[in-house]
Amino acid sequence: MSVRKRYKVTYVLDSCNDQLGHRLDANCLVLGRYFSEQGSAPVTRALYSGGRDGQLFGWDIGYDYGKASQPLAKIQAHSAWVNDIALTHDSEGVISCSSDSTVKLWKPHVLNASCLSTIGEHTDYVKRVSIPKYSKSPLVASGGLDKRIIVWDYNVGQEVMRFEQLPDCSLVVGPRSGVYSLAANNNIIANGGLQKDIQLWDCVSKKRITDLVGHTDNVRDILISDDGRTILTASSDATIKLWSLRAQKCLFSFIAHSDSVWALYSEHPDLKVFYAGDRSGLITRTDIRNQPNNQSCTAICKQDAPVSDIVARQSFIWSTSRDGSILRWKDEPLFNQDVGAALSKHTSSHLSVSSDCPSRHSSDIRNHSCPTLYHDDAEDIYYDLHHTESYSNINLTKTPDYVIHGGIGLLKYRMLGDRRHVLTEDAVGNKCLWDILACKQAGEFDKSEDFEKIVQSLDTVQAIPRWASVNCLLGILAVTLDENHYMDAEIYADECPLLKVDSPSDKRINLGVWILKNLFREFIDAELHRDLKFRQNLDVVRSEAKKQIEAQREEARKGNVNMPSALSPLRIRSRPSPLSLPPEPLLSPTIDYSATPFPLEPPPESPGPSLQIPSNNPVYTNLTDTDSMMGAPDYFSIPARQNRNRKPHTEVVGSPTVVRTKEIIPPKVTREGSFMGRLKKLGRSKSSKSLQTDFMKASVERAASSRVFSTGTSVTSPQALSKTNNTVNNAANTENNTLAKDKQQTSEASSPGTPRELKTTGELIEDLHEQYVHFKDKDTVLSLMKPPNDDTFPMLNLSSQITVIISEESPEAGNSRDIYRSTLENMADDIDLLENIMPFWLGRLLLLNEFPSKTAPTVNFTLQPFPGSGLPLIVNENTRLSASAMLRAQKIMDYSYSKLSQQRKDVSSLQFRCKDVVVTPKMTLATVKARIWRSGDDVVFHYDVAPRSVSEIVDKTQSLNI
C-alpha cells in the first residue's frame, strides 16, 4: 500500500530582486569558464558559487583572474542550502547539491527554462558532489545524509550505480553515518563523515574496499591525487592527513591548524601543494615538493569568519565568508622561514615522519611490495610537519585584495496575532512590516528601534488561527500553505482594508482560499477557456465516438475481440519532470537524449468514491457567497445530547457517477496520444477543421472506454465484456495468465458506477470532460467548473514577480521537494505542466470551489450578572452555552439584551466584562478566550448596564499583556 504524498503551496515575497550577491553565507566555490549563449567558445573565466540562500552565481574574474568581479549569471536553483558544487568537464554546466535532497545541473549560458534540470534525488540532505578528474564520461557522484553514494549520468539524469553503507560499515570506529566529504576518480570513491574514518569504494566491483582509520573527529574534506595513489583528508580534529592507498596507511599528519579544518584545495597532480582553511578563518598553503627546504607551511591570511570553501589559481585565493561575501586574497608568502619554527622554539630542525597514526589493513588489496610507512619511496616523497602552536599572536593579513559583496538577507521574523502581518529584520538591521495577504511591504521602521518593542506596539488582541507558516530560511520571506490548515482562518470583512467599505458587517472571508485564488488566477482563467472550447465541440466528439464503437462491435462479431485502443490514452497522463525540460546533453549536442518519463502508478485495486481525496475528513462542501467556510453557525446554542439514531446531514457537491476503467498500457504512449494531450489543443489558435479532427480522435478514445452514450444506455454490458474477456483468456497460452488477469480486472473496473481515486488536477479535468460527453445530446451543457466567486474573494493587485512553488512531501523522504516553481508573470505558459503536477485538493478548490469540510472550533461560556448590578439571571447559572469561536461578542450582547428586556424594561444597553476587562462588540469568542480568559475552563461573561457616556467606560483592553 503506497503512502499518500502531501503537497504544499509556497509564495515568496522579495523586495530586492535586483540585488547582486548571495543573501546568506556562501558555502562553496569552483573555478571554470563562462561560455557565450551559443556555447561555442568561452567568453571569460568564471568563479561559480553556491550559498545558503539556494542561489547559484557565476562571477566574471577575467583571463588574468584579477578582474573586479561582476555577476555573469545567477539562478534560484534550490529551495534550501546549496552544500556543494562541481563543474562539468567542458565547463558548460555547474552541478549542485542541496539540503532539499536534489542534485541539479545548471547551464549558465542558457537563458531559457531549460537551463536548470534535476539530475537525481536522495532521501535526505545531499552534502557533497564530486566529478572524476580527466574522466570523459558524464558521471558525477553525490553523497548525503541518507548514507548513500549515488553515481549519476548528468547528461540524461539517470542513476548509474549506488553504494550504501551497511549498519556495521565501520567496525573499529562505530555505526554508519551520513556522507560529509566525498572525492572520486575513475576507479575509486572515498567518503568520510561522523564515523571518523575514510571509506573506500571500488567502482568496478561496486563494493567497499577498506576503511582508513586515523582521524578522531568528523572528516570534513577529501582530495584524491591524479594517479589515485594518495588521499588528502581534513578533519574537525584540526589535522590534515596524507594517506597511501596502496599501503592503506597514514603517511603524514599535518597539524598546522589549531581549529577544525573545513576545506582543502589542490591543483597539484600528487597533492604536494595544497591549501587549507579552518573554522577560525585561517588559510594556509603547504608545499612539500622540496625535501631539503624547511619552508613548507605558509600562513596566507586570516579572515573573521569560518572558511567553508576555498579555491586558488595562479597568485590568487578565493574564500567564502559571512553575509554572502566572497573574498579574494593574494597568494604571497608572509614568512621566510618555517611557520612552525616561528611559532615554537621546540620545533625540530628537520622534518620527521609521524609515527602515531593508527591504520587498518585490508587483505583484499594489500600488496607486500607496495611502500609502507617506513618505505624508502615514502621517505623520498613526503615529509611531516610538527607544531602545535596557533597563529593568534602573528600579524596575518586580514584585509582581502578584493571583496565580492553579498546581498541583504532576512534573519529574523515574527507573525503578528492578526495572522496577516509579519515583521522582519535583515542582516543590516532594517525592519519591515509585510502584509502577506496583499503580498507587499506595509511599513518600515528605524534601525535603532528594538524588534520586540515594535512587535508589542503592532500586535493586537485578535486571536486568529494559524492558516499559513512563514520562514526566511533563504534570506527572503516565504509563506507556505498546506492542505490541512489553509482553511483554518477567517476574518470579518469590516476588519480588512482590502475589501469594500460597504461589505456586510457579518460577512467573513477565508484567508487561505482568498490568496490561493489570486495566486492561481491565470490557471483558473485558462482552464475556464479550455472548458468552454471543449463544450463547444461536444457534437463532433459524440458523433465520432459512435462511429468508433460501431466499428468495434463489427470487429467483435467477427471474433476479433480487442480491448478499446482508447483505454490507454484516456488514463495515462505523461508527467514531465518538474522544474525542468528534457535535459540537453553537454558533451554531445548532436545526440538527442530524451528525459526519462515519469513512472506511471497503477490504479488502486479497490478504487474509492468518485472525486475523493484522502483526508481526515473527506467530506467536501461547496462555498456559497453567504456560507461560512468553517461550516458552523454564528449563533450559539445550548449543547444537547446527540440522537445516535439520527444520521448527520452531509452534503456532497459535484459527485456524479463516473465510469472507471482500468489502465492498459500499450507498448508506446506519448503525450500527444493521450486524451488530454489532444483536448488541450482546443484552447490554442488552430483552424476549425483541425479542432474537429482533434476532438474526433478524443471522442473515440473516451467514448470507447466508457461504453456509455448521451442516452445513458450501455452499449455492451459489463457482464458481456467480462464473458468475452474470459473466453479470450481461456484460449490464451498459460504464459499469458498475468495479462488475462489484467483484462479481467479491466472489465470489472469498466463497470458503470465504479469510481477511481483522483490524484492530480488533470485527472479531475478528465472526469469533468467525461461527464460532458455523457450529457444528453439536446441538453445545454453548462460548465461544471465553479471557481471561487469574485464577489466573495475579490481580486488582489499582486506583483507579477511573486514566485509560486508547489512542493511535495513523502514519509520516506527527509524533507519536501519542489515540483513546480514559477512567477505569476510566467504561469500562463505552464498550464499543461500545472495540470499534471497540481495536487487534487488544490485543483478541486480552484476549479470547483470545493474543499474538505471542517468542524469549526467552539467556545463554551456562561452568562452571569455583574456583582452589584442588580440584574437578573438570563439563563440558569449552571447552564453552559456554546458557540463558534468566530462569533462576535455583539451577537451575545444582542441575545442577552433580548432576554433581559423581557424582565427589565429600564435596560437600554448592556456592557460585557471578562475578568474585569471590558469586551468590545467586535471581539470574537476566540479572542476573548485566548487573550483575556487564558484558561481551558468555560469563559465567564458578566453583563452590566452600559454607562451613558463613553468617558465612564473603563476599558482595560489596551493594557493586556499580549
From Swiss-Prot:
GO terms for molecular function: ubiquitin binding. CDD domains: Ubl_WDR48, WD40. Residues 568-615, 702-758 are annotated as: Disordered. GO terms for cellular component: cell cortex of cell tip; cell division site; cell tip; cytosol. SUPFAM superfamilies: WD40 repeat-like. PROSITE patterns: WD_REPEATS_1 (PS00678), WD_REPEATS_2 (PS50082), WD_REPEATS_REGION (PS50294). GO terms for biological process: double-strand break repair via homologous recombination. WD repeats lie at residues 25-69, 77-116, 121-162, 172-211, 214-253, 302-339. Residues 707-723 have a biased composition (Polar residues). Its main location: cytoplasm. SMART domains: WD40. It is found in: Cytoplasm; Cell tip. Required for the ubp9 recruitment to septa and cell tips but also for its enzymatic activity at these specific locations. Interacts with ubp9 and bun62. PANTHER family: WD REPEAT-CONTAINING PROTEIN 48. This is UBP9-binding protein bun107. It comes from Schizosaccharomyces pombe (strain 972 / ATCC 24843) (Fission yeast). The gene is bun107.
